[in-house]
Amino acid sequence: MAKAKFERTKPHCNIGTIGHVDHGKTSLTAAITKVLAETGGATFTAYDQIDKAPEEKARGITISTAHVEYETQNRHYAHVDCPGHADYVKNMITGAAQMDGAILVVSAADGPMPQTREHILLARQVGVPALVVFLNKCDMVDDPELLELVEMEVRELLSKYDFPGDDIPIVKGSALAALENSDAKLGHDAILELMRQVDAYIPQPERPIDQPFLMPVEDVFSISGRGTVVTGRVERGILKVGDEIEIVGIRDTQKTTCTGVEMFRKLLDQGQAGDNIGALLRGTKREDVERGQVLCKPGSVKPHTKFKAEAYILTKEEGGRHTPFFTNYRPQFYFRTTDVTGVVHLPEGTEMVMPGDNIAMEVHLIVPIAMEEKLRFAIREGGRTVGAGVVAAIIE
């Protein structure tokens, strides 16, 4: 069969499968591609192809992730599936594979298990906006009351971690039945129902171009007779010539006006998300701006020094620390384009953090950085990455 060409006209959404080991995340991923392949919305990808996921590097950390793509009536999806639990932790914290939503896979035969809990907590901490549940292996449970019990347990667990447990769609089925064509109701039909729920329940993410303008400062030049040019890659939004913008982070926030946008030495009337541009700033001196600050739409982002974070600390095999660290550890936190020193405060009852751990912690930076929830950072010691993290909540 000829490979169907993907039409890029549908809105795009990034999702992934999460849940406890052996509850059927990878089987479900394969089953989705199998069922959607019937309507030309996917190319069937077998279990073993997904399971031997290639290694990738994100922020200096090696992660194994499998990527498949498929489409439904409404959307085009990029779907990530990780072979091991550690890969999920790293993936979600580094944002290597950004998730606009996730399918939580729970085995009906086992109910929620330790990693079910941990993945829900991680999804909450790193800001995954919405979850849909697939209750897998329902063909192994004969008692409908038992299924209801597991469903109640899952809903309670979701509510405990501040997801709307009562409203989240839970689809009952069997990924294996779909792969083996054994039971149409629990297999094929359940997968289609799952995708209908994912389409309906996971909100369409706002495209970067529609969000308020932000550009991390990479370099600053002064051009005689023209003023100061700041270069960088536009992270989101649009910058038009004549726009008023703020310079945020490290020092007091300054206001300025963009009097020119250039790309590849040509003058443009605007730069947008994804563009590498130089922005000419009116009346701003070369020494007023530095790498590590951001240009942004006025009022859209504030500078902060204290925040709660979820972080993963590299093992020594991954090039990380060889020894644990304690409260008052002072590494550098690399945000966007620069390192800022910060002090780590561990939660009550956590004596120390070992290489390979993931941990919730509080950080106090010595200078403010433009930040918001979900912002990713690296933890470094003398330029060497020893961890990765994400801002879970801002304190001040």
Swiss-Prot record:
Q: Where is this region: G3?
A: 81-84
Database matches in Pfam families: GTP_EFTU, GTP_EFTU_D2, GTP_EFTU_D3
Q: Its principal location? A: cytoplasm
Q: Where is this region: G2?
A: 60-64
Binding positions for Mg(2+) per the UniProt entry: T26
Task: Identify the GO cellular component terms for this protein.
Answer: cytosol
According to the UniProt record, where is the region G4? 136-139
Q: Where is this region: G5?
A: 174-176
The listed locations are:
Cytoplasm
| Catalytic activity entry | GTP + H2O = GDP + phosphate + H(+)
Annotated function: GTP hydrolase that promotes the GTP-dependent binding of aminoacyl-tRNA to the A-site of ribosomes during protein biosynthesis.
Q: What is this protein called?
A: Elongation factor Tu
- Organism the protein comes from: Rhodopseudomonas palustris (strain ATCC BAA-98 / CGA009)
